[in-house]
Amino acid sequence: YTYPARKIGTFLADADLTHVSNEVSFVEGCVGYTGMVFCSKPKYIETLKASGVDIVELTGNHNNDYGSKYNKSTIEKYIELGWDYFGGGLNSEDASKVLYKEEKGNLLAFMGYNWYDTVYSSRALAGSSSAGANSYSVEKLTKDIKEAKDRGAVVIVTFQFQECYSYPSSDVVYPICYKPLSFPDQKKVFRQAVDLGADIVIGTQAHQPQTYEVYGDGLIFYGLGNLYFDQDEWIGTRQGLVLSLYVEDSNIIQVKITPIIVDS
């Protein structure tokens, strides 16, 4: 069950902090998927262990596919393992918390939001007594970034946006995916986070890499693509990006982009 990480796990684990977005809950008896409903066998958490995961992002829109109870039990497993999480939680209050991590004298603030389900569907979002993703609002984003900047933290913002499986016109799934950015609003939303003070903004929804840019005083990566999600229908969904952030004196001084490909 560590097979997916056999060639990349050591590289990922070498970081002081390894952050991954996982949007599939672990379900006993999981036998695969039907349509767009996903789960994972519990033993595949060994892949995350082999990758040296420290922080799990929970902004994804599939963690509640088998019900929030499995999302809850999955989060409880992360807690048991001593892993931190953000962008989702055991309830809406827990999901909205900003994760602060101090590493080698640097303060980092991780904050994540599910933009897509806030706008189009609520099934993936946390409720007052149910697990799920953190909802998005400009007011919440503004408040979170201001508080983090006031504390002198490096602000890392992540978004779950519209997912695109492939951009070529011959095999595109959704018409909106004909363009590099999935929605006209994506650039606006991501740039607004930088305008509010974010140091780096990352789209963790993409099934294949999207564009990136230096904008104002920040960096924006609109989509990193797949890591362990096994979509081999198109070459695009077998590709991904791993970001290595180098931080000194609570400033991002370098970002290294490592391209990856799933060799099935």
Predicted features by range, described:
Residues 1-264:
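Acidic, metal/ion-coordinating pockets
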